[in-house]
Amino acid sequence: GQESCGPNEVWTECTGCEMKCGPDENTPCPLMCRRPSCECSPGRGMRRTNDGKCIPASQCPEH
């Protein structure tokens, strides 16, 4: 079943790669499905912080 997702995360059947805050923000993603999970969706402008939170890219700390 669907696990409970954290703030800003979305349950996704076909997860791609998440994007982290920081210099690797523009790393291209492989177009493959990973296992279903809670995704911090880059398509919605979200980024994963180093401590695992999912926040809007505009709130990323300056690097």
UniProtKB/Swiss-Prot annotation:
Location of the protein in the cell: Secreted
Family statement: Belongs to the serine protease inhibitor-like (TIL domain-containing) family.
Residue ranges constituting the TIL domain according to the UniProt record: 5-60
Site positions per UniProt: Reactive bond: 31-32
One GO CC term on file: extracellular region
Gene3D superfamilies in the cross-refs: Laminin (2.10.25.10)
Alphabetic keyword roster: Disulfide bond, Protease inhibitor, Secreted, Serine protease inhibitor
Positions of disulphide bridges: 5-38, 14-33, 17-29, 21-60, 40-54
Claim: Isomerase is one of the keywords in the record: no
Stored InterPro entries: Ser_inhib-like_sf (IPR036084), TIL_dom (IPR002919)
Protein purpose: Defends the organism against the host's proteinases.
Subcellular location, principal: secreted
Annotated GO MF terms: serine-type endopeptidase inhibitor activity
Name the UniProt record assigns to this protein: Chymotrypsin/elastase isoinhibitor 1
